[in-house]
Amino acid sequence: MGGNAAERARGIKLMIFDVDGVLTDGRLYLSDSGEEMKAFNTRDGQGIKLLRENGIAVGVITARSSRVVERRARELGIELLRQGAADKASVFAELLSGQNLNASEAGYMGDDLADLPVLIRCGFAASVPSAPEAVRTRAHYVARAAGGEGAAREVCEFILKSQNALEHAIGGYLA
């Protein structure tokens, strides 16, 4: 994981996240009235903001569609939100084209088999410790923290550290 992952993360200009199991713990809360609730970790959100503040675009690709995800993306300033993505690889290609990037300049963090088509195409693949072995073994970086419990933040900081930008990123909070 170490050196190769850092080398791959160094060139990332776009980081894309799955939602369920990555930005959340993967559990869905459904009410009788049909409302869907998800819990997001504020530290993950801060990590996403740090990426954006340091010139790294952030996107979300998720197979499900949810107003909750739309709201959270808006709160974090994520404009590259694609929900209801049955074919994540084609959505990934569309995002790359829209940002005028090639696959080696994009990272992706996923947690399940549906994420494999993107994980094997991107320049920097990240996952969570609870992901199936088929996903973990194809990831360049597997977070120590669980999905929805700081895994995304850990990956954001890893990218910034790989780009020698982490100290600069947190510097504004030390003033």
Enumerate the language-model features and the residues they cover.
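Basic, amphipathic juxtamembrane/active-site segments
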Residues: A6, R27-K49, P129
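Short coil/turn segments at beta-strand junctions that form active-site/ligand-binding loops
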Residues: G11-K13, I56, S104-E105
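Fold-independent oxyanion-binding glycine-rich loops
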Residues: V19-D20, D25-G26, R64, D111-D112, ...
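Mg2+-dependent phosphoryl-transfer enzymes with acidic/Ser/Thr/Gly-rich catalytic loops
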Residues: G34-K38, V68, R74-L76, L80-R82, ...
